[in-house]
C-alpha cells in the first residue's frame, strides 16, 4: 500500500537536502578557488593580470624617485668629503689613499643600487615566489575546489526533517562564511600586491639611506619588510593548501563526511567518545557541521595575520 505520509516526508527531506547540497557545493567551490588569483602567486610584472600598473611603477621609479635618491647620495658624498677635509685640517696631512678609494667605491656601489633597485627587488620577489608557486602548495590548494557533497547513497526513509533543516541552516552559514573568506583573501592579497609595488617604486630612497651610518638601519628595515611582504604570499598559499587538509581530517572525526549520519535521527555520532545525554546526541551533527564555519573563520584570521607572521619569521 502506498504510504502518502512517508512519500511527503521523503519529498520534504529531499528538497531540504538538495538546498543544503547546493550551499555546501558553493562553499567548496569558493574556498577551492580562493587562491587561483595571480595576485598571490603571479609574477612581479603581472600581479594584477597585466603590466599596466607595473608600467606606472617603473615610470615613477625612473622619473621621480631615482633623482631624489641620487640627491641623497650626493649629500652622502658631501658629508664624507667634509669629514675628510676636517681630518686634513686636524692632522695637516693629505688623506690616505684608502679614504679616497673607499669614497669612490661607495659612490659606485650605491649608485648601482639606486639605478638597479627595481630589478633587484624583482629578483628578491622571484625567489619567494618560487616558494609560493611550488607544487607542494599549489597542488594541495585546489583539492577542496574538486570536492562535492555526495548524496547518491542517502536513505531518505531514515532521514529526519529536523536533521535536514539543521543541515540547511548550517550549509547556509557555511556558504556565507566561505564568501567572507573569499572577499577577505582577495582584499588581503590585493593590499599586499599594492604594498609591494609602492615599496618597489620608492625603493631607491631607503637604499640611498644605507650610505649614512645614522640612517643605515632604515634601509636595512626596508629590505626586511619587503622580504616579509614577499614571504606573506607564501604563507597565504600555505594556508590555502593546509586548509582543506585540516577541514577533511577534523570533520571526518565527527562523521561529517557521511550524510546519512547528519540527517538520520537513529544514527550515532561520537563527538566526545561517549554521548552522555539525549540533547548532546540530538545536536552532535550540528557540532560537526559548525566546524566548517569555525575553520573558515580560522582561515580568515590566518590570511589577515599572514603579514605579521612573515615579519616575525624574518625578525623585522
How would you describe each model-predicted region?
Residues 208-224, 312-315:
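Alpha-helical transmembrane segments
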Residues 71, 75, 79, 107, ...:
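Hydrophobic alpha-helical transmembrane segments in multi-pass membrane proteins
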Residues 57-66, 98, 102-105, 191, ...:
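Alpha-helical membrane-interface segments at transmembrane helix boundaries
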Residues 72-105, 202-217:
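Hydrophobic transmembrane alpha-helix segments characteristic of membrane transport
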Residues 1-72:
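Binding/recognition "hotspot" determinant
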Residues 5, 12, 16, 20, ...:
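Non-cytosolic segments of integral membrane proteins
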Residues 66-79, 295-299:
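Hydrophobic alpha-helical transmembrane segments
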Residues 1-16, 93-113, 219-232:
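Alpha-helical transmembrane segments and their helix-start/interface "positive-inside/aromatic belt" motifs
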